């Protein structure tokens, strides 16, 4: 399904949180807080033609109670206003933009995560 955000909005896929503590305790999905970072999947025409400050593939940080959650083709996304983006963590070259698994992302230098923990 294709989705095009309107106004100054972006479609973001949240990054997955670690489901295990450093001591090996598995955290159930309902006890985990949702991550406050994600990969920009689609940028509205107003942003792509205007400020160009955020682009597809950027890893961004956003506020805890910001945006609207939607589900497209069984995948959860966030629709965020440009002003709700706190900053860019990594620009366009994170392993998540290429659908790589964390386990295989160690060779990607520009990835947004510290893979020593994984």
Curated annotation (Swiss-Prot):
GO terms for biological process: chaperone cofactor-dependent protein refolding. It is found in: Cytoplasm. Its main location: cytoplasm. The keyword Chaperone applies. One of its GO terms (cellular component) is cytoplasm. Together with the chaperonin GroEL, plays an essential role in assisting protein folding. The GroEL-GroES system forms a nano-cage that allows encapsulation of the non-native substrate proteins and provides a physical environment optimized to promote and accelerate protein folding. GroES binds to the apical surface of the GroEL ring, thereby capping the opening of the GroEL channel. Heptamer of 7 subunits arranged in a ring. Interacts with the chaperonin GroEL. Belongs to the GroES chaperonin family. This is Co-chaperonin GroES. It comes from Helicobacter pylori (strain Shi470).
